Amino acid sequence: MALKSPAFRRKFPLLVTGGLLALQPLATSYAVAAEQFDCQVSAAGGWDCKPKAPVNNLPPRPVHEGAAVSSGTEAASEGETADRPMLVTEAKGRALKSRSEDYSHLDWVPREKLTAAQLAETGPYCGGAYVEPTRPGMADTTPKDESPTYINAKVSKYQQEQQIATLAGDVVMRQGSMQAEADEANLYQTENRGELKGNVKIRDNGSLVVGDEAQIQLDTGEAQVDNAEYVMHKSHIRGSALYAKRGENAIIRLKDGTYTTCEPGSNAWQLKGNNITLNPATGFGTATNVTLRVKDFPVFYTPYIYFPIDDRRQSGFLPPSFSTSSDTGFMLVTPYYFNLAPNYDATLYPRYMAKRGLLMEGEFRYLTPSSEGQFGGAYLNDKDDDRKEQTDYKDQRWMVNWQHKGGLDERLMTEVDYTDISDPFYFQDLESDQIGVESRDLLNQQGALTYRGDNYTARLNVHAYEMATISQITPYDRLPQITLNGVLPYNPGGLVMGYESEAVRFDRDLKDDFVRDKDGNPDFSAGAAGRRLDQNVSGIARANGNRFNVAPSISLPMEASYGYLTPKLKYAYTHYDLDLDSQGKAQAIAQSANPAYGSYNSSLNRDVPIFSVDSGLYFDRNTSLFGTNYKQTLEPRLFYLNVPYKDQRDIPIFDSSETLFSYDSLFRDNRFSGTDRIGDENKLSLGVTTRWIEDNGFERQNFSIGQAYYFKDRKVQLPGIYYKDRQSAQSDTSPYALVYNYYFNRDWRFNSDFNWDPDSRSTRSGSAMFHYQPEDNPNKVVNLGYRYRNDTIIYDSTTGTWKEGGSYGNPGDPNYIKDYYKIQQHDFSVIWPIVPQWSVIARWQHDYNRNRTLEAMGGFEYDNCCWKLRLINRYWIDYDDFSQALPANEKGDHGVFLQIVLKGLGGVVGNKVESFLDQGIQGYREREDQAY
């Protein structure tokens, strides 16, 4: 039944029905025993009820066993003899089994009874889930003061004079989305309140409060439940309190309450506080005088805490984290989040370090319809004096950064990536919690504006670098760089006419001041005492300059279902305006006698025609392999390239390097990256690829092999390298390039490449990688890989020259290491469940070239429905710039890392574990993203 409140009086509309009359349409009678009443609104605004004479004799009212309404005396007598109900404080963090053995009173459903959809939202190690039962009105959004009220009970009694209704037996009251249930209820009409007794349940949109007794305000929905337990279904949250108060705004306040995401039978962890407030409207809770209890044992205290109860954002303290290390001592981070608006927010990261002091760090994030980004900054007055004698160190440590991506319209895009730091040792000594800040040797200080037309792209770029190391030479800045690339909008006769153009200024300031190491002694890394690495840069390599490049091209793509043929002609013209200091000019004159170097000219021009023909065929056939049907393809490819020799020794290297040899490099028109070198080549590259494709489109495996045939030597080289001293530049053939990939299924894959040199009958480079991670169980991760490379061209900062091979420095130098840059490594990592809830975590990366372990770690993970623990023993090579010599800065380090994650609160200790697992184990991030 439903009854609207009279418009002139905001009172709870009372309507009681018995048995089969429950939840029927509007009526005006009360059912009490064998009598009926007519009830009308009185002049005073209350109810005026009079007995109604029945038309026919009513049949006897059915008696519900155990549901009779008792008098006050009878109730008191019964209470004296009944067993005292168990208090929630006696359960020590667990749910009360006295209310239901299977915790069904909290809507707990065992895992085996969950539907497939419910299982998908339940953690793999959870024994069940809180499932809100379907009920009438649960999605009702009508305001309380406008909602009709429905009441159902097996037996009812109404006292006309006192206007008190007494209900018994499966009492249900519903108004809007809120529903109250109890064994018995007394409803006081004049006070608009009710008293509920026995198995009390109060439900509202995704929440449930259970107790022994309750007081409820009938017109507002306010309620107080004694000896209460509560559940928030979607957030997997439960708890208890001496009493719980539900406000008119659905906010739940708990006295001496608890909060946890653990299963009903577990007390693995809980927050226990004097006063806990849960606000479903904001998605956050607060608590005062809080102890974090593990197995009901207090392990942490805070006078105040602010925590999420769902995935929404709200201002307040985020879960703190603490750790300890030799660099910082004890460290405590207490982040505070500012939810300023739906589209922008801020986070403050106060970081206390016992050895260094208080680092204040913060970030501001923004999101607009056309852009997104963040500002950040940090400051520390560093108390640690380990580096106080070292050059470039500053005790006033700071960092500022700005990342931005946006579009002024659908064609015009803007980008900013800017980071600046106080000294080059900032990221070696300090950590950052900011999103988007990367710790690397060269920090970007870049801004770009890009316009995308229908057939072209124009870009204005300003790109400088901030050094976060002293063991590298200062790089060139692009101040500015303008590019315009595209194709003409018409294609006469099928011709494609394209163009590439660039105008850029390269500039850098080479340092020449005196350098001291960590102990205050002159640094000998660069040769002479106190010498900067920048002073090893000599000759025209010291030049700054402007570069203008334009490269129009014309091609004729001819395509058919069985293959393609694309002849192409490109003309590259480059102009340089250079400026060089007196030191560089003098050195350039001396170096010009060496055939590997050029001479200095302030103005240079270079023009190079590039002709290529790319062609390929496509064949396929139906075949069978091990009982599986496949479509096998055969895709031969032929590529001819002719680039005449142009002497480029007078041109400095601003942004070029030699690309590594691979199967794909057989079909490139330049073996150098950048613009400062265009390789001379007259070659014919042959390659063939075959694939096995199943009927459903899944590519099971593919294999490619290729080789290039050279018709002349490759004379164009990087400065300091003479082609006659390099065997690979005079060979008639390239190494054989092989690529093989096999996909066991969508979970397993094997990827490999192999480059074998027939002249030296040795492997130039190669790699093999096995990766396993089931799509339906990403908790299993296995990686096994091997890498080998002995054909690198490196820039040696100790000599300021390019050279072939992997040695650091020259023989006789104190820091010389043979084959330092040669790669010969294996990498094995695994995360594997050994028994339910327990997984082993391990990684071993070994360098065979120098016979050393680069990183080794082993440990275990315990994953529970409500918490996770990782304990990992780790050894790694740490890089810390105490001098300019790279090898001298490599030191082995060791640590034991403990990470504890309380689900629903976040990481309490060991957040650093996330970073090295993410960087070191392929598939770890995918595993965590799909974890509960």
From Swiss-Prot:
It is found in: Cell outer membrane. GO terms for biological process: Gram-negative-bacterium-type cell outer membrane assembly; lipopolysaccharide transport. Residues 1-33 form the signal peptide. GO terms for cellular component: cell outer membrane; transporter complex. Residues 54-87 are annotated as: Disordered. Keywords: Cell outer membrane, Membrane, Signal. InterPro entries: LipoPS_assembly_LptD, LptD, LptD_C, OstA-like_N. Pfam families: LptD, LptD_N. Together with LptE, is involved in the assembly of lipopolysaccharide (LPS) at the surface of the outer membrane. Component of the lipopolysaccharide transport and assembly complex. Interacts with LptE and LptA. PANTHER family: LPS-ASSEMBLY PROTEIN, LPS-ASSEMBLY PROTEIN LPTD. Belongs to the LptD family. HAMAP family: LPS_assembly_LptD. This is LPS-assembly protein LptD. It comes from Pseudomonas putida (strain GB-1). The gene is lptD.
